[in-house]
Amino acid sequence: MYPVDLHMHTVASTHAYSTLHDYIAEAKLKNIKLFAITDHGPDMADAPHYWHFMNMRVWPRLVDGVGILRGIEANIKNLDGDIDCTGPMLDAVDLLIAGFHEPVFPPQDKAANTQAMIATMAQGNVHIISHPGNPKYPVDIPAIAQAAAKYNVALELNNSSFAHSRKGSEANCRAIAAAVRDAGGWLALGSDSHIAYALGIFEHCERIIAEVNFPQERILNVSPRRLLDYLEQRGRPVIPELAEL
């Protein structure tokens, strides 16, 4: 069990079913020490309004010993790597995930998908690329792993890709984990929970990690401190309320 979950959605993304309060309660049951709420960026049809992300400053940082990060799963929009988290929104979030979603960036060929993903990393704002193993978006796996290491961006192993969505992702996810291992990059684990009961469930990710002998020291979820150190190293401000996690 990893004590950090970096990808989940609330009822603010209306195809999800749990609230922030639900996730806090579930985290306490599962001994999850830190999680990031990452609702969809505003270019998705059922995403929260811009104001939702700007007003996350009202959230407490720590509730009953559980740390809460303010995040977003932004959408990669084009071949230039532009995303729908810009301007003041960049300062409103602690954790910025970005990925491909069909309503915003329809699947293209391997060269175009690879170009867009690497361009997104090169812009310097994104911390994690979400579900890069989606078979609908073929990419040059060694190239994206090398770019992720170069730009200090984590590639995600998404547990939901093995269970509920993006069928056929497993072979790509295994290859991505191995390529990130060889490139010396970071892996991030995300439950991609759309209901609180799935918080912190990484069983499929853990199997892939074991199969490719991925080093634990390159997984962001190993401890709250590792994730917070990474974000600070990437230029995010220190969060004093979470210093003791």
Curated annotation (Swiss-Prot):
Its EC number is 3.1.3.-. Signal peptide: none annotated. It is an enzyme of class 3 (hydrolase). Transmembrane segments: none annotated. InterPro entries: Phosphatase_YcdX_put (IPR023710), PHP_dom (IPR004013), PHP_phosphatase (IPR050243), Pol/His_phosphatase_N (IPR003141), Pol/histidinol_Pase-like (IPR016195). Binds 3 Zn(2+) ions per subunit. Zn(2+) 2 binds at residues 15, 40, 194. Pfam families: PHP. GO terms for biological process: bacterial-type flagellum-dependent swarming motility. Zn(2+) 3 binds at residues 73, 101, 131. Its cofactor is Zn(2+). CDD domains: PHP_HisPPase_Ycdx_like (cd07437). Coiled coil: none annotated. GO terms for cellular component: cytosol. It comes from the Bacteria. Zn(2+) 1 binds at residues 7, 9, 73, 192. HAMAP family: YcdX_phosphat. Homotrimer. This is Probable phosphatase YpAngola_A2446.
